């Protein structure tokens, strides 16, 4: 299957949450998510108990490789751009990957309305947009309110991981994450990654440009 074989499920003016062709669509500027989110869970996750999630999945190379590596874990790929969702979907279909689900929408909307408490065993954010200009920083993913959502969604002892090429973004994210999660690494709580992180398109892009890759992990402590 080619990416363009995945058709949009609705026109913008008719937007609504739906599951179609293995993709959960959670549109922005829609105000009745709660009416759908109570019923989708069984259809989409089918009683899987070991669940991991990647945010900012891009073209899907990394998450597809993870799903192939461990078929006992259900992976969720969250990506807001439909052109990229199409590419993830095409890889999922062509490789016949049964343990991968795709969410087309923002991470914030998906977590607020569709992710239950203590649901995830692992959450990975790969190369999120750092929004480097000061006036744009309100658009960053790892805002304090979303870090709280992350903590809520993780099981006790679950791991959160972040990979980025932007050191300023890394350090500010570490500060935000410490309000709800505990670092797994010693000070300064991150490492520089010299080896390939896992065939991410963005990782390959930044390495070809000579960028350093930074990686950090946090853990959800019991009772938080």
Curated annotation (Swiss-Prot):
Pathway per the UniProt entry: tRNA modification; N(7)-methylguanine-tRNA biosynthesis
Record-given protein name: tRNA (guanine-N(7)-)-methyltransferase
Residues annotated as binding substrate: 133, 165
Catalytic activity, as annotated: guanosine(46) in tRNA + S-adenosyl-L-methionine = N(7)-methylguanosine(46) in tRNA + S-adenosyl-L-homocysteine
Superkingdom: Bacteria
Family: Belongs to the class I-like SAM-binding methyltransferase superfamily. TrmB family.
Lineage: Bacteria, Pseudomonadati, Chlamydiota, Chlamydiia, Chlamydiales
Keywords recorded for this protein, A-Z: Methyltransferase, S-adenosyl-L-methionine, Transferase, tRNA processing
Function: Catalyzes the formation of N(7)-methylguanine at position 46 (m7G46) in tRNA.
Protein EC: 2.1.1.33
Any one Gene Ontology molecular-function term assigned to this protein's record: tRNA (guanine(46)-N7)-methyltransferase activity
Cross-referenced Pfam families: Methyltransf_4 (PF02390)
Binding-site list for S-adenosyl-L-methionine: 54, 79, 129
GO cellular component, one term: tRNA methyltransferase complex
Stored SUPFAM superfamilies: S-adenosyl-L-methionine-dependent methyltransferases (SSF53335)
Gene: trmB
Catalytic site positions: 129
């Amino acid at each position: 299957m080619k990416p363009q074989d995945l058709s949009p499920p609705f026109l913008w003016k008719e937007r609504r949450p739906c599951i179609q062709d293995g993709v959960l669509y959670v549109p922005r500027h829609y105000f009745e998510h709660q009416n759908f989110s109570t019923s989708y869970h069984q259809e989409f996750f089918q009683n899987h108990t070991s669940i991991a999630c990647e945010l900012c999945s891009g073209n899907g190379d990394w998450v597809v490789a993870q799903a192939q590596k461990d078929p006992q874990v259900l992976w969720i790929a969250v990506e807001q751009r439909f052109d990229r969702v199409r590419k993830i979907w095409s890889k999922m279909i062509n490789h016949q990957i049964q343990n991968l689900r795709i969410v087309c929408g923002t991470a914030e909307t998906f977590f607020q309305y569709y992710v239950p408490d203590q649901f995830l065993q692992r959450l990975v954010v790969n190369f999120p947009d750092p929004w480097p200009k000061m006036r744009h920083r309100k658009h960053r993913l790892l805002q304090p309110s979303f870090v709280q959502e992350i903590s809520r969604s993780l099981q006790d002892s679950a791991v959160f991981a972040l990979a980025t090429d932007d050191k300023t973004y890394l350090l500010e994210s570490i500060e935000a994450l410490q309000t709800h999660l505990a670092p797994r690494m010693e000070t300064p709580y991150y490492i520089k990654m010299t080896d390939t992180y896992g065939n991410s398109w963005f990782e390959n892009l930044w390495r070809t440009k000579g960028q350093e890759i930074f990686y950090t992990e946090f853990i959800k402590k019991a009772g938080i």
